[in-house]
Amino acid sequence: MATKLIKHGSKAREQMLEGIDILADAVKVTLGPKGRNVLIEQSFGSPKITKDGVTVAKSIELKDKIRNAGAQLLKSAATKAAEVAGDGTTTATVLARALAREGNKLVAAGYNPMDLKRGMDLAVNAVVEEIKKSSKKINSQEEIAQVGTISSNGDKEIGEKIAKAMEEVGKEGVITVEEAKNFSFDVEVVKGMMFDRGYLSPYFVTNSEKMVAELENPFILLFEKKLSNLQPMLPILEAVVQSQRPLLIIAEDVEGEALATLVVNRLRGGLKVAAVKAPGFGDRRKAMMEDIAILTKGELITEDLGMKLENVSIKSLGTAKRVTISKENTVIVDGNGDKKNIEDRVLQIKSQIAETTSDYDKEKLQERLAKLSGGVAVLKVGGATEVEVKERKDRVEDALAATRAAVEEGVVAGGGVTLLHASQPLTKLKVENKDQQAGIEIVIEALKDPLKQIVENAGENGGVVVGKLLEHKDKNYGFNAQDMQYVDMIKAGIIDPAKVVRTALQDAASVASLIITTETLIVDEPSSDKAEPMPMRGGMGGMGGMDF
């Protein structure tokens, strides 16, 4: 067991804050319409250029263990904001740094950290309520395009394409992003389906940066029962390995030995595979699996019809152009199903909707209908170079997530204005003691920082602009950093999704509270010895690299 380095009190917190400063300084330059790019060295290939806060944060690992602990805590605020709302990562980073730094100063001055935390929590909850009160629902294509434009750092084309994609498949529809083979940026609607089941093991992930499993041109095996032993599947698995194509297994469940064997073979490269649970429950699960079978031109392997896994041939497997699996969802794009069969299935579901008297059944049938007939909108992002395409694709993905958040919870005035004006009612909050009051004041000051940073990235004095805006009673009055003018932010179309602003603040406060209430830090002591790398083991011979 490695020896440990133990630090206590203000020394531990100060070193953690040094790590937080290093990460925050790298991330904050990306904030706002005039934020700068960050160039990140890759382990192979050309460097990555990005203006996405969470991408910058994820790339940072510090040599000093204690400073790194602080940096990793701050990174978790950005990552959580990205997971929940898809955007607001830089705002979360700026807020968390401000809250943690001011909180630590007060702890060092003798304030009670637990009361400071209570005061901060009271203030954050009050600001969240203010954000909810001031949010405005969006409906029009123009408003959707505005959110997409702002979230992609002012790229109008991205905003317009996202609005067009939502018009094609609906606001709740499935929209994916992929790289184009040319210079253009297009929206294409293809046959596809999304269901709410993710991968059964993170070891199936092929893209570790986004934590998704991406299968190109896969076979799809649909099995009605649980899979706990792969012995009956050996003939079909060997046929798939020979074809050199990936395999997606959709079953009631894949467990125990079967799951372990698939994972081992996936890691050793013998079999490109992923497994997910079938969507739905009971009879509805079977119906949805039949929908997938029709969409992908496969067969549902069901013992009711006397079918057995050992007798299944590759002809019984469905196929699709691409499958993307995240922790929570599976998207099947461009299944190779027969158009006539899909249309017949759609008509069958429509007639079931007309006949049913249960509101619940009707709702579930309509969900199936939407999945089968709605299709998937694909945003195809092109560019002159690989670096440009990847950078733009990142911005499109961020903008799409932010637009979905805006549709869900509405929008508020952007540019840091909502957080700034939400700080004003906090002075009226009633607390039990001066330490809790100090916690509220920490939040009031921190809420100015995102706007200050946006203004400073545009080359102006942030403190002067903040002072000028606080003199105004209009909560939508703000500073347009793009045109360097004071405007009504809502009328000017400078808006942020309420969910993004809310999540950024809550995640930042959570991380800052952890830091100011930390008294002892334990990390591994740095070691000069380098461990020998483990040799890679191959699969067993005679099975095409598979190991069963």
From Swiss-Prot:
Stretches assigned to coiled coil: none
EC number(s) reported in the record: 5.6.1.7
Compositionally biased intervals (Gly residues): 538-548
Chief place where the protein resides: cytoplasm
GO cellular component: cytoplasm
GO biological process, one term: protein refolding
UniProt-listed PROSITE patterns: CHAPERONINS_CPN60
InterPro entries given in the database record: Chaperonin_Cpn60_CS, Cpn60/GroEL, Cpn60/GroEL/TCP-1, GroEL-like_apical_dom_sf, GROEL-like_equatorial_sf, TCP-1-like_intermed_sf
Family (UniProt): Belongs to the chaperonin (HSP60) family.
Protein task: Together with its co-chaperonin GroES, plays an essential role in assisting protein folding. The GroEL-GroES system forms a nano-cage that allows encapsulation of the non-native substrate proteins and provides a physical environment optimized to promote and accelerate protein folding.
Name this protein carries in UniProt: Chaperonin GroEL
Species of provenance: Rickettsia conorii (strain ATCC VR-613 / Malish 7)
Gene that encodes it: groEL
